């Protein structure tokens, strides 16, 4: 048996001379030197796709075909009409338009959007496509959100919360969070204190000064009592998130406590440096070493009273490693918080009452390996009394709802497939879902009523679809790719089985002139009886002549999905696999145990045993090559 199980580059170097024949088109230089040009040949897909408020334009960052590989992405826009061509925007033009197309928080009536751009806060009129600037400071403001009535915008500045009145422009500070050492009582103690008391007893002038100081202090304290009450964080603690209730009755403060600073970090030598000397890159800590943690405070407004919450219930030994506020319900009566323990084996969902900070656990997910999977952080409010979230509770990432009291848990999707993205429509009538329902090798978009029921498939073309919905929910900007075509922007209607029209073309004409295949996906039998997905490149598929040898490509990145019908993140290797097949090699690309896309058990199959099933799947791949191709 001749099996080459090394890096692809070395495999080609070992190829028999008699097999160095290619079926590549004479119009295309099918050489390693050419295909490894990467983005200069294949192009770079559009990124940061957003819509204009009126839904007429799609904005994105991109470079035109043939642009140098190290050129920065540029701003573009294209009309959301079939046959339109992208228009390049200058950076000053984009700076003017950026607040208009930035993501942000919609007002309750969906007529305005609060956004942040370049550290300042703006409000966008969605009907008139106009922008009102609210702040213009050197301080960085962020996280703008409307209050329940749409009359105020909350935002953050210098790790504190503020509110601005949209009618009169008044800015009010809602929190006074401080770091460092709290001030101490400066009154002298001991001998010096006794001496000071003696002085006031002996001299009228000292008593008069003390009386005036006492009156002034009382007045300062009276005025200070009308302001937000300050409170101090621990040493080494910082503000991570502040989330204000829509009715401004309370806020949640999430802090981060640095632990990784004291952990030992792995080092990688960096040989190519400006100085000419080898330098050290400190890149990451080891699993199980000291890590960051966080805690959550409930702050009553306007009093500023603070209540620290036990976010991991019934356990004082564990601190949450990851805490995120998933939002408040529209009524402002409760917040939703997600917390993952620092061993990554338990995820809690809690509701927190705006009245007193009372915490109610509504869902707990435990995993003996680790919490993960697609859409792991997807959660929010379906309405004022129900929560939606994605969980791997049944072994696959699916959508659930539960009451804010923890009752009435319902699973809205099920099957041996995954919900990879979930979003609630602005009117809260629909879920927009990206799923692998068709097969693990496809990603399509569906629309489903918020209460569950029949899902309507929006996209129909094979491959992967990443959809951004227009503000009026009529159109979709679809970043669509197939196994042999990179992602491009398409436009279509948000309707079942909609037809989409291509608006961008990223690869060079040179690359498009070559016949790139969609590799067949086969299931090979593993030694434990489980079928393992494989992309296969045969010499006959690309016009080559078999040379009796095979190559097994091993994708890296651990938890990655690479066997699918869409464009691979390993696109250079995709082209290289063509190159090998054209020269006679049978190439296998295996989604071994530990890869993404096949549910929780597949994802965690390598837990504490890397080099077990993942390696055996490749050994079984070599047996498949021997059996099917005599290699």
What is each residue range found by the language model?
Residues 2-3, 18, 22, 566-567, ...:
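Compositionally biased, low-complexity segments enriched in small residues
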Residues 428, 457-459, 464-631:
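Serine-hydrolase catalytic core recognition
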Residues 2-10:
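Sec-dependent signal peptide recognition
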Residues 9-19:
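Hydrophobic h-region of N-terminal signal peptides that target proteins for export
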Residues 19-469, 474-487, 491-494, 509:
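Beta-propeller folds
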Residues 9-10, 165, 328, 617, ...:
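Extended hydrophobic/Leu-rich segments
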